[in-house]
Amino acid sequence: MDLEAWLGLPGVAGVDEVGRGPLAGPVVAAAVILDPARPIDGLKDSKKLSPARREALDVQIRERSLAFALGLCTPAEIDRINILQASLLAMQRAVEALSHRPEMALVDGNRCPKLTMTAHAVIKGDSRVPAISAASIIAKVHRDRLMLALDEQHPGYGLGSHMGYPTPVHLEALERLGPSPCHRLSFAPVRRAAERMQVALF
């Protein structure tokens, strides 16, 4: 069965995650089952949308979809099981949290999480499958909001502007302040900063 045929099936969930690359904060996944009777215009990969457009689409997706759910893995879980496994687990949690059980899941990327229904990985799915685009949008909006909250809890790193990604501002703050509780110690720049802080203490 090809992608066009899958897209025509009822009860197909689109699944995507955001936040694999950042040095801080959770990885967040979403699963969305769109309602064919309530189409949403402008769905595309969240990275290609402005923040304001993502926010507007987030509202529409939540209002018009048959079901949506979010799942995440914390920095501690990421450090324990690695970022790839944490991304898959976050996606699994999102699908399992759906109020409607999908007949099939279409997952962005080249790997599928462990699911109790048929699942297919779709390369560049966030640009090709509307339900995956919708999942990428609500996952991105939710994660950005979490990072704004973490910025208030852990000031000085600029988490609310770079969302935890390894920008020069973030790396400089890590060097100066050391890691916060929301940083991922398994990521090399964070680990090096933690080791330098340990050396400085002694």
From Swiss-Prot:
Any one Gene Ontology BP term: mismatch repair
Required co-factors: Mn(2+); Mg(2+)
Residues bound to a divalent metal cation: 16-17, 108
What EC number(s) has UniProt assigned to this enzyme?
A: 3.1.26.4
**Domain RNase H type-2 positions:** 10-199
**Disulfide cysteine pairs (residue numbers):** none
Q: What is its main location?
A: cytoplasm
Localization recorded for this chain is: Cytoplasm
Keywords, alphabetical: Cytoplasm, Endonuclease, Hydrolase, Manganese, Metal-binding, Nuclease
Listed InterPro entries: RNase_HII, RNase_HII/HIII, RNase_HII/HIII_dom, RNaseH-like_sf, RNaseH_sf
The GO terms describing molecular function are: manganese ion binding; RNA binding; RNA-DNA hybrid ribonuclease activity
Give the catalysed reaction(s), semicolon-separated: Endonucleolytic cleavage to 5'-phosphomonoester
Source domain of life is Bacteria
Query: Family assignment?
Result: Belongs to the RNase HII family.
Task performed by this protein = Endonuclease that specifically degrades the RNA of RNA-DNA hybrids.
Name of this protein: Ribonuclease HII
Q: Which organism is it from?
A: Thioalkalivibrio sulfidiphilus (strain HL-EbGR7)
**What would be the name of the gene that encodes this protein?**
rnhB
